[in-house]
Amino acid sequence: MQVEAHLQKIIDQDGKVHLTLIDPASQTPERAAEIALAAVEGGTDAIMIGGSTGASGTLLDETVIKIKEKVNVPTILFPGSSAGLSSYADAVFFMSLLNSRDLGYVITNQVLGAPLVYKSQIEPISMAYLVVEPGGTVGWVGDAKLIPRKKPDIAAVYALAGKYLGMHYTYLEAGSGADAPIPPEMIGAVKKVLGENKLIVGGGVRDAKTAKLCASAGADMIVTGTIVEEVKDVAAKVAEIVSAIKS
């Protein structure tokens, strides 16, 4: 399965993609698989696996394996560092945190992780990762110089730089469990310069109204993370959001 081509096909057919993010550190592999299955029943298009505190090793591998046993949608690694790689996944967001002050998150982790990606034949999907205020845990761990919420032009030039460096995707991140999502004005400004390149938006997307606002502003893909770990009926919550962004 070529994951990037698969996601493009969904965009061509449905207009938008929904991604569910599962952090292996937040629950057992078995529970992660149950959440993934419920999300797929709700209409999610792919499962992202990872977290900013860097789940790795056996826990990560077992989580990926259990999820793949339950669902047939793509599994995409979302690593917090080079340790967040698993040869069992279908693809990896091979990303650079462009607004980090720490070179480790800009390039060093990528250098360390590249050989494993090469040897295991995981599909790399190049991505510029941009952390916006408030930033949450990822902003702190990644030592990001947070992009101000009221400065969409700064986000746009970062995204443009990522595009010119050859990255296919740009991810605007407000931080896991953020009180507010990425502002629509920022999403629109970034999508304008990206053109055909794909824009992912995540952080603070907790309901259908917010998801639709982000999608209408220009996001090609919407990520739902924290909320699927909190609600009792994951399938219903995901279905509500998927319906909003694809209608």
From Swiss-Prot:
Transmembrane segments: none annotated. Its EC number is 2.5.1.41. It comes from Methanosarcina acetivorans (strain ATCC 35395 / DSM 2834 / JCM 12185 / C2A). The lineage of its organism: Archaea, Methanobacteriati, Methanobacteriota, Stenosarchaea group, Methanomicrobia. NCBIfam families: GGGP, GGGP-family, PRK04169.1-2. Pathway: Membrane lipid metabolism; glycerophospholipid metabolism. CDD domains: PcrB_like (cd02812). GO terms for biological process: glycerophospholipid biosynthetic process. It catalyses: sn-glycerol 1-phosphate + (2E,6E,10E)-geranylgeranyl diphosphate = sn-3-O-(geranylgeranyl)glycerol 1-phosphate + diphosphate. Mg(2+) binds at D23, S52. Prenyltransferase that catalyzes the transfer of the geranylgeranyl moiety of geranylgeranyl diphosphate (GGPP) to the C3 hydroxyl of sn-glycerol-1-phosphate (G1P). This reaction is the first ether-bond-formation step in the biosynthesis of archaeal membrane lipids. Keywords: Cytoplasm, Lipid biosynthesis, Lipid metabolism, Magnesium, Metal-binding, Phospholipid biosynthesis, Phospholipid metabolism, Transferase. Sn-glycerol 1-phosphate binds at Y171, L172, E173, A174, G175, S176, G177, G203, G204, G225, T226. It is found in: Cytoplasm. Its cofactor is Mg(2+). GO terms for molecular function: imidazoleglycerol-phosphate synthase activity; magnesium ion binding; phosphoglycerol geranylgeranyltransferase activity. InterPro entries: GGGP/HepGP_synthase_sf, GGGP_HepGP_synthase, GGGP_synth, IGPS_HisA/HisF. GO terms for cellular component: cytoplasm. Belongs to the GGGP/HepGP synthase family. Group II subfamily. This is Geranylgeranylglyceryl phosphate synthase. It comes from the Archaea.
